[in-house]
Design a protein with these regions (language model features):
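A membrane-topology feature that recognizes alpha-helical transmembrane segments
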Residues: 1-168
Length: 168
């Protein structure tokens, strides 16, 4: 078995890069590509194999399974997007049982902040500012009715990545 702090950190950095792609896609098109979520899922076993940290992967799989079942239920009820549910489950796989509760709290707080912005006049001010800076994509995202919750999930994923990087 190949164990390396550097390889572990590279796998976590790839996780972060994939989260950024998911968030950007969610902001631009309100879609999180299945290929990105699949890449995040397939990268996890690589991390488990190369990290010198002790990973409780069976319980991480249990957290993932619970998250995907609950998330798909919420998606079927029209409460949560399917892409968001899949991305959250993938992030919680990486989080495992130890980091999952705090990761969910971070996602909820950031999601709440985004919701507050989307429900107030602040979004129009921010949209105008982004438009004047030449970022029409961000401006349009702020003026849309949908909320890119993948951004909040990505913030939770950043916490997971930070925790994993600092634990080895």
């Amino acid at each position: 078995m190949f164990v390396s702090v550097q390889a572990s950190q590279v796998s976590v950095a790839c996780f972060v890069a994939l989260l950024l792609v998911a968030a950007a896609s969610d902001v631009v098109s309100y879609r999180i590509p299945n290929a990105v979520v699949l890449a995040i899922l397939l990268l996890y076993p690589v991390y488990v194999v190369v990290t010198p940290a002790d990973v409780d992967w069976p319980w991480a799989l249990a957290v993932f399974a619970a998250a995907i079942v609950i998330g798909m239920g919420l998606s079927a009820a029209g409460i949560f997007g399917a892409g968001d549910a899949k991305l959250l489950a993938a992030v919680l796989l990486w989080a495992g049982p130890e980091l999952a509760p705090l990761t969910l709290i971070i996602c909820l707080i950031i999601g709440g902040v985004i919701s507050a912005i989307m429900m107030t006049r602040v979004r129009f001010v921010l949209a105008g500012a982004f438009s004047s800076l030449g970022s029409q994509t961000l401006s349009n995202a702020l003026l849309a009715k949908n909320m890119p919750y993948g951004v909040a999930i990505t913030a939770g994923g950043f916490f997971v990545a930070w925790a994993l990087m600092t634990s080895v």
